[in-house]
């Protein structure tokens, strides 16, 4: 009898969930009969030899690797902080926050049943599933977060940043993913929802940055995500700081052109 590769990984105890198994497979960490296999849905006999290579994924999903890069490159410190993970899904960002000292994480997602069981049972995690961040108010949470990550799909960041700002502590920080496929006009999105034109990437990044500045966020850093999105889209990480109401910073020190070029040079090989 044949089974999916991600199912076999979970059954053998090589992965804690199918989502984590998929992340490991996509990261090239799984060898089947000494051959690298990158499709989670590939079917194999139950007795097939499966070997993991390299160091195991440290988070419940590969999303944690995105926040890990943001923390290193943006000099973020989460020790002792209350945080919020918007678009939590399986909880890769939440897991990364906890492993870096967060004392509490509000894990917010419009879906349900996705958050990894380990995190769902962690007393430091408040699972806010079936929850649209656009309608969350301060009365829904016990403390204002001082750090928020945003990883949302099928919606522009410009629809999410203001509701998040209204929940945050003064001087709170954000690490948000800019996803060109959900920011660009429909006519600029290619087959399978892929946006590959660097000029469009630059355009949507500048649009998001301009909007963030208009609602009193300071823009501190910009980097490209270390891994592509599910369909192969390059994504970007932006570091924002909540300024006092009505305060705007005209200048930013981020070089959008350089970051976009570096992203394509690195990830399009």
Predicted regions and their residues:
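S-adenosyl-L-methionine
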Residues: 106-159
């Amino acid at each position: 009898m044949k089974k999916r590769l991600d199912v076999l990984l979970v059954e053998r105890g090589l992965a804690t969930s199918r989502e984590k198994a998929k992340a490991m497979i996509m990261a090239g960490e799984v060898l089947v009969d000494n051959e690298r296999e990158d499709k989670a849905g590939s079917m194999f006999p139950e007795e097939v030899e499966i070997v993991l290579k390299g160091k195991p994924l440290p988070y419940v999903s590969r999303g944690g690797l995105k926040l890990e890069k943001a923390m290193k490159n943006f000099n973020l410190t989460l020790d002792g902080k209350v945080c919020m993970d918007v678009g939590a899904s399986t909880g890769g960002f939440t897991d990364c926050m906890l492993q870096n000292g967060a004392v509490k994480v509000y894990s917010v997602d419009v879906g349900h049943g996705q958050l990894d069981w380990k995190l769902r049972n962690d007393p430091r995690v408040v699972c806010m599933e079936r929850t649209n961040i656009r309608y969350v108010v301060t009365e829904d949470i016990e403390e204002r977060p001082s750090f928020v990550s945003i990883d949302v799909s099928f919606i522009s960041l410009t629809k999410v940043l203001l509701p998040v700002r209204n929940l945050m502590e003064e001087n709170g920080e954000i690490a948000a993913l800019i996803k060109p496929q959900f920011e660009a006009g429909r006519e600029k999105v290619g087959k399978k929802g892929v946006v590959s034109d660097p000029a469009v990437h630059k355009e949507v990044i500048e649009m998001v940055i301009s909007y963030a500045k208009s609602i009193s966020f300071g823009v501190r850093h910009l980097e490209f995500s270390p891994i592509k999105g599910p369909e192969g889209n390059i994504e970007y990480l932006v570091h924002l700081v909540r300024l006092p109401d009505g305060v705007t910073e005209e200048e930013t020190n981020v070089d959008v052109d350089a970051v976009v070029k570096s992203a394509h040079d690195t990830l399009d090989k």
